[in-house]
Design a protein with these regions (language model features):
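Extracytoplasmic "Venus flytrap"
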Residues: 29-53, 75-82, 104-106, 171-180, ...
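Beta-alpha junction/loop-to-helix N-cap segments that form part of ligand/metal-binding clefts
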Residues: 30, 43-50, 62-134, 203-208, ...
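An alpha-beta-alpha
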Residues: 37, 140-205, 321
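Hydrophobic alpha-helical segments within soluble ligand-binding/sensing domains
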Residues: 84, 144-167, 180, 209-212, ...
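Periplasmic-binding protein-like
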Residues: 91-103, 123-125, 169-172, 222-233, ...
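Extracellular/periplasmic bilobed ligand-binding domains
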Residues: 115-118, 183-280
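Extracellular/periplasmic periplasmic-binding protein-like sensory domains
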Residues: 240-315, 377-390
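Segments of small-molecule ligand-sensing domains
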Residues: 300-308, 312, 322-379, 391
């Protein structure tokens, strides 16, 4: 996308954090968050909330934004789409000029719809379904994340091209748009590059019973080279445990929902092996030279190390907003959206460019691969598929 964009200078992390302080001002730039701190969405949104808080403090310590203090107000969306929409309305009524939406289309879409109705830019910390687009939500709405087209293709490329796994068994949780489209794009790309899907099955989040699916798999009389499970929360561990207990020891692949320490703990040292997932970044210097600076700031605020890349998505969302506001010289929704469309952004979660509104605000972004062994994650590196499915 670079050849269709004007090359705009990006000040970068160091400029945001270490530039001289701006002139003091009595007014504020208010960022409103509808991130869910309770419920099923909390393992993704709470880390983002923490990362956003670190970013706001860093901005204010460096003098603020446009000479103004940055204030971040988050109201718990409670993992309920209706509540998320109502929270967004409340935040806008209280003066929010930018909206941070939850990390999912089903849970975050209502916040971005309200932002759009108010003429404000909204950015989801990590929604990856292509429904999180200007096509569905409006010309001022964006997601920080790669789309599932990239996430699914990255997983398929790793399986077939890098590891030589030719056959796959796919389980799709019917929970939300994210889980369904991630499997869709994995399957499409895996077949395109020569892989064979021996069986596709479904699961309903919260069932905690995988026996019917196991019966159908066992009836095939053959074992797959790789197992792709698109699910959410600790149900992922339920399915992996069930498969391992009856002798299916093939490697397991998944998406960014696996980037959850609770899942790693549930699997433990015995079951948390030969598992691979695609996510947003890695919380170490291997992923980005500025990551140690962020980790130090995070530890100073929370007295603990960040343990998931969703922390970095919160930081990056605020810093992305800040850079776009600086470029626009205003928080006006149309101007900030234009800056986001025209900019090239270097983030902890990877370099990012957006297509214009007609192109859905599709994000051009790489992905990170992580391996889980003995219940502990390790960094495999950045990946960018040579081709991806159409959304």
């Amino acid at each position: 996308m670079t050849n269709r964009k004007s090359m705009l200078a990006y000040a970068g992390l160091a400029a945001l954090l270490f530039a001289g302080p701006a002139e003091a001002a009595s007014d504020e730039i208010v960022i409103g968050g509808a991130l869910s701190l309770t419920g099923v969405q909390a393992p993704l949104d709470t880390p983002g909330f923490k990362g956003a808080q670190v970013a706001v403090k860093a901005l204010n310590d460096a003098g603020g934004l446009l000479g103004k203090k940055v204030t971040f107000v988050n109201i718990d969306g409670k993992s309920d789409p209706v509540t998320v929409g109502n929270v967004a309305v409340e935040l806008i009524d209280k003066g929010a000029q930018l909206i941070i939406a939850p990390c999912d289309f089903d849970f975050g879409g209502p916040a971005s719809r309200e932002a759009q109705a108010a003429g404000l830019v909204g950015i989801s910390t990590c929604a990856s379904d292509p429904l999180y687009s200007s096509w569905s939500l409006g010309d001022k709405q964006f997601t920080l994340s790669m789309w599932n087209t990239t996430m699914g293709a990255t997983a398929a490329d790793y399986a077939f091209t890098e590891r030589g796994w030719k056959t796959a068994y796919v389980v799709t949780d019917q929970f939300i748009a994210y889980t369904k489209s991630l499997s869709k794009y994995f399957v499409e790309h895996f077949k395109t590059i020569g892989g064979e899907i021996i069986l596709e099955d479904t699961y309903t989040n919260g069932d905690n019973d995988f026996s019917a699916q196991l019966s159908r798999l066992q009836a095939l009389g053959t074992k797959p080279d790789v197992i792709f499970i698109s699910s959410y929360g600790t149900d992922i561990a339920v399915m992996i445990r069930a498969l391992r207990e009856v002798g299916y020891d093939a490697p397991v692949l998944g998406g960014d929902s696996y980037d959850d320490p609770a899942i790693h703990e549930a699997l433990g040292e015995k079951l948390g092996n030969d598992i691979y997932f695609v996510t947003h970044t890695w919380m170490g210097p291997e992923a980005h030279p500025d990551m140690p600076k962020f980790i130090d700031l995070y530890k100073a605020m929370y007295n603990e190390d960040p343990d998931t890349s969703f922390v970095a998505t919160g930081w990056d969302t605020v810093m992305l907003m800040a850079e776009a506001v600086k470029m626009a010289g205003t928080t006006d929704g149309a101007a900030v959206a234009k800056a986001l469309e025209e900019g090239e952004f270097k983030l902890l979660t990877g370099d990012l460019e957006y297509q214009d509104a007609a192109g859905g605000h599709a994000p051009d972004k790489a992905a990170v691969l992580v391996e889980l062994n003995a219940g502990k994650p390790s960094f495999l590196g950045w990946r960018r598929p040579a081709s991806i499915p159409n959304p």
